[in-house]
């Protein structure tokens, strides 16, 4: 679901330093997929250990998360639970797309097409249960808060933000706004110079901030109407949306008729084009399956032995680099906790 066109006027670049001392609830799966897609060898294949196991996600979680904490930010990684039944069509679509990419990847390898290899290697990326569990284990060893969502991780991260347990939710997807996040930060874990897909061009990617209240005020709508706009153009629960309706048309329709049902009643949208349950999908965004976290939401001291065991002994990471990372992490945690404490005190004066 891409609301990009209608958030353009309210999103702004935000420096990591502006988030110093603040907690950010991060959609873990979304972030790990970013690492798997972005952290690659020159030929486009992911980083692997001596046993052929993918390690791109661990590399990203370790080194890039350290950089985030060095900026004074306290990350909270939120992992997916069981997805809603309504998401099964989208999950199946993604599975087919990956299978197709895998076929094209093998063909590109046989033909020695390196640009195509890189392209399809990224498209074919998969996140296994083992990779998820290792990610949780690494984050825990690093002293970073981990929350297990009952349902969608993105919904839980947004909920944590909506009840002020974090300053913002972080994800590449705009769904966080539909789930009620007050603030959404994009590009927090992938900022810096990045190569454009299939091009020898590098661009500077910077974190972006979108505030829900500012967006709704700018558009002259409420959150439920924003959800209806998303439903019309397609969400994870109705991937195809309504044929022929883009985001600007959807905005015009909802502003004129207030909701999808009224637009159907007035003949603006043909009922025959609606092959999904509007109310059920709307409900999944308004009242998603979430819980108030019982997990620790503070940074803790890292466990050096467990980090070395997982990265160096199990996955062949360079020991000197990891030890250097651990020293950076220890210092960053100490400073981030100090900044958070001072930020909290400043609010009283």
From Swiss-Prot:
Keywords: DNA damage, DNA repair, DNA replication, Endonuclease, Exonuclease, Hydrolase, Magnesium, Metal-binding, Nuclease. It is an enzyme of class 3 (hydrolase). Signal peptide: none annotated. Mg(2+) 1 binds at residues 27, 80, 152, 154. Its cofactor is Mg(2+). Residues 116-258 are annotated as: I-domain. Residues 1-98 are annotated as: N-domain. Its EC number is 3.1.-.-. Structure-specific nuclease with 5'-flap endonuclease and 5'-3' exonuclease activities involved in DNA replication and repair. During DNA replication, cleaves the 5'-overhanging flap structure that is generated by displacement synthesis when DNA polymerase encounters the 5'-end of a downstream Okazaki fragment. Binds the unpaired 3'-DNA end and kinks the DNA to facilitate 5' cleavage specificity. Cleaves one nucleotide into the double-stranded DNA from the junction in flap DNA, leaving a nick for ligation. Also involved in the base excision repair (BER) pathway. Belongs to the XPG/RAD2 endonuclease family. FEN1 subfamily. This is Flap endonuclease 1. The gene is fen.
């Amino acid at each position: 679901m891409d609301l990009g066109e209608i958030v353009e006027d309210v999103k702004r670049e935000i420096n990591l330093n502006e988030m110093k001392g603040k907690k950010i609830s991060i959609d873990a799966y979304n972030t790990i997929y970013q690492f798997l897609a972005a952290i690659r060898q020159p030929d486009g294949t992911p980083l692997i250990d001596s046993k052929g196991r993918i390690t791109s996600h661990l590399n990203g979680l370790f080194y890039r998360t350290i950089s985030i904490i060095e900026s004074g930010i306290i990350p909270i990684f939120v992992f997916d639970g069981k997805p809603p039944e309504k998401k099964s069509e989208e999950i199946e679509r993604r599975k087919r797309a990956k299978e197709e990419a895998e076929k094209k990847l093998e063909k590109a390898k046989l033909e020695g097409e390196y640009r195509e290899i890189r392209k399809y290697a990224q498209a074919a990326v998969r996140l296994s249960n083992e990779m998820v569990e290792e990610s949780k284990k690494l984050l825990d060893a690093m002293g970073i808060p981990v929350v297990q969502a009952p349902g969608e991780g993105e919904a839980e991260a947004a909920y944590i933000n909506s009840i002020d347990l974090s300053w913002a939710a972080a994800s590449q997807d705009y769904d966080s706004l539909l789930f009620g996040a007050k603030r959404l930060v994009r590009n927090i874990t992938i900022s810096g110079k990045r190569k454009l897909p299939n091009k020898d061009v590098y661009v500077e990617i910077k974190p972006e901030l979108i505030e829900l209240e500012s967006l709704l005020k700018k558009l002259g709508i409420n959150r439920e109407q924003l959800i209806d706009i998303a439903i019309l153009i397609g969400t994870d629960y109705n991937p195809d949306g309504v044929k022929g309706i883009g985001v600007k048309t959807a905005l015009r329709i909802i502003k004129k008729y207030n909701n999808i049902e009224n637009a159907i009643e007035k003949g603006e949208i043909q009922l025959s084009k609606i092959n999904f349950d509007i109310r059920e999908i709307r409900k999944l965004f308004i009242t998603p399956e979430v819980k108030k976290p019982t997990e620790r939401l503070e940074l803790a001291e890292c466990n050096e032995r467990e980090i070395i065991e997982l990265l160096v002994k199990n996955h062949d990471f360079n020991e000197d680099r990891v030890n250097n990372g651990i020293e950076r992490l220890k210092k960053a945690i100490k400073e981030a906790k100090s900044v958070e404490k001072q930020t909290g005190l400043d609010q009283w004066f």
